[in-house]
Amino acid sequence: MGSFSIWHWLIVLAIVVLVFGTKKLKNIGSDLGGAVKGFKDGVKDGSTSTDTPAAAPGQVAGQTAADKTTIDVEAKQKG
């Protein structure tokens, strides 16, 4: 009674699919995968950024013209 059989899990899965739908579950999976990838990239970038020397106090690190560029975008509504 304490452990669930495969039939219990299949019934739970069927109910979840009926409630949320396959499209919503696919979007959740994609979002979760993107978050994991972003976390891994952040951890990797964090370990390499300590290797670069820091600018001396009072000095500004080299900035490129791309830092001063503004990009105008609009958000799209899902629907």
From Swiss-Prot:
It is found in: Cell inner membrane. GO terms for biological process: protein transport by the Tat complex. It is a single-pass membrane protein. It holds the Pfam family TatA_B_E. Residues 69-79 have a biased composition (Basic and acidic residues). One of its GO terms (molecular function) is protein transmembrane transporter activity. Belongs to the TatA/E family. Part of the twin-arginine translocation (Tat) system that transports large folded proteins containing a characteristic twin-arginine motif in their signal peptide across membranes. TatA could form the protein-conducting channel of the Tat system. This is Sec-independent protein translocase protein TatA. It comes from Delftia acidovorans (strain DSM 14801 / SPH-1). The lineage of its organism: Bacteria, Pseudomonadati, Pseudomonadota, Betaproteobacteria, Burkholderiales.
